[in-house]
Amino acid sequence: MKKTIPVIGMACSVCSANVEKKLQSLEGINSASVSLASRTALVDYDPDIISLEDMKREISNAGYDLVIENDRSVEEINRREFTLLRRRTLASWLFAILTMCFSMGWISHTSSFANQICLLLALANLLYCGKQFYVSAWKQFLHHTANMDSLVALSTLIAFLFSTFNTFFGEMVWGARGIEWHTYFDASVMIITFVLTGRCLEEKAKDSTASSIRQLMGMQPKTARLVTYEKIEGTNDYKMEEVPISTIQIGDMIEVRAGEKIPVDGVVTQAESFMTADAAYVDEAMISGEPTPAMKKAGDNVLAGTIPSQGKLRMRAKQIGENTALAHIIRMVQEAQGSKAPVQRIVDKAALIFVPAVAAIALITFIIWWLIGGNAALPQAILSAVAVLVIACPCAMGLATPTALMVGIGKAAQKQILIKDASALENLHKINALVIDKTGTLTIPNQNIDFTKQEDLDLETRETLKPHAQEAMKQLQEKGIEVYMMSGDKEEAAHYWAEKAGIKHYQSKVLPGDKQALVKKLQDEGKQVVMVGDGINDTQALALANVSMAIGKGTDVAMDVAQITLMSDDLLALPEAVKLSQKTVHMIWQNLFWAFIYNIICIPLAAGVLHIFGIDFQITPMWASALMAFSSVSVVLNSLRLKLS
């Protein structure tokens, strides 16, 4: 059983890696993938062995929280968390401004009164605005782990305690020896302020990456017009009642009027419009991508989320709740956005050692400055170590891949391209061979002819090419992808359709096993193969291919096996999917490059490495916190550029 569960308390990629590792260690869980970007865990588990309550208890023991209550949606949780974050950020800015005024402007920096006021302001900032960092760091400490919150908590606590010591004993310890001393409450406050500000901006940006899910969820109406069994007096019609969609049962009769969203999947029992007495026209563009409204008569199926554009219809509920086609699409997109690309698993392993490595670098920095710092050795050593702890940013590494994937998968869904898992989107850009089934995939059979006499029929009469098939094949081949058409037809027919579609390679008289054999042959030649099919006889080849695609109007078996489903008959979705994969992967590597380069350059600068070369430049803790906030926000904003492409 698969389920997507919201996770509370994750601050960086170390957190998501810890939660994932803990879930995977539990008996009864087949697989678990935790996404920092969506703050969810995609868990495949056996409910007979482990329950959601068991998972929640184990994750709570590890310092995080799983939200398993059905009445608490991810949207609601994220909204509440963001409201609290924003409130603390605004309060932190107030404390920061007051602290800066007292420490730098109004009264002398060494004034005992000013330092005591700054101490109180910094303490209030730590206890209220920075509470989440210390609670999280303490939980991590109890479980012998560390995350980004640990770095923030440690650095601000060191700066605060050192400043508190100087406030009460500075003159006695340092002044008596002729050493100039300072307090650094402003650094402690500004670190928390900048980190909170960065997280606020990051959350807003991440919220934009999930817009595709919200659009899909927006297609689900909240209420339905239920046709009751109570007749209207003096007529043969029945009374209707507006009810919550959650109360609809299978078999209920529902009326939907023009412009309203169909609430559940069902079968039309009655339809009418001003154009046709016995039919209504339903806009299915959001599901199938077809721009022309489909005619629906009694006996036709309709899907939740689609909209009658003309007329009204009555329907009997067939699939409700999580069993509707729309719910399945939403679930598929959520699971895909929560899944991990292969490169993300490598980053997660690096993230697990990142925080201990940064702590070690900070300790080494402290020792070196303590030894070579002269009279101001201790303050310089402390500030340098604090700057190193603050500037390190595992968040940027953790967000680099999932944010790009979330935007890419969401954008694909808007184009009626449903991607089941992140690895398919990542691998699609590598393909250099495409195997496509002819009938039902490349062409549309004519349903209005007698196939017992098809030998006497013209090829064009039997079937037609799908929309933009020639242009799609041309674009694929221009990208360097070799296209192979597989057909069960005789040589003459196969040659005709291959030539008409602009395909150079084709096979005729193909049996189901031949498709699998061709995929294997191409792979043995070193090619990365994508298989596109729509029928049961394509499933073996789909399962073997590096990337598999099914047509949305094909069989359920083919769609279950395929990693990518094209909801539209427009084959331009094929090159569009490849193009989107290329852009997404390019964005991932851009993000990773920035995340690693940022840490590689900024950590040494914060440690003061330029002093070795006689350059008197070093990043202060205050600027370090600003740069750290900027680094994670920039990664998310860069990923959002995909939405504009």
Positions of predicted regions on the chain:
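Soluble-to-membrane junctions at the N-terminal ends of transmembrane alpha-helices
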Residues: 75-94, 116, 136-159, 330-362, ...
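Juxtamembrane coupling segments of multi-pass membrane pumps/enzymes
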Residues: 174, 187-258, 296, 418-420, ...
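Membrane-embedded alpha-helical bundles of multi-pass transporters
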Residues: 108-111, 142, 161, 411, ...
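Conserved cytosolic catalytic loops of P-type ATPases
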Residues: 27-49, 53, 182-185, 215-323, ...
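Conserved catalytic phosphorylation-site environment of P-type ATPases
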Residues: 287, 383, 393-458, 541, ...
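Conserved ATP-binding TGD loop and adjacent catalytic N/P-domain core of P-type ATPases
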Residues: 38, 419, 429, 442, ...
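Transmembrane helix-loop-helix hairpins at the membrane interface
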Residues: 84-223, 233, 619-621
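Flexible metal-binding regulatory segments at protein termini and peripheral loops
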Residues: 1-115, 230-238, 327, 331-339, ...
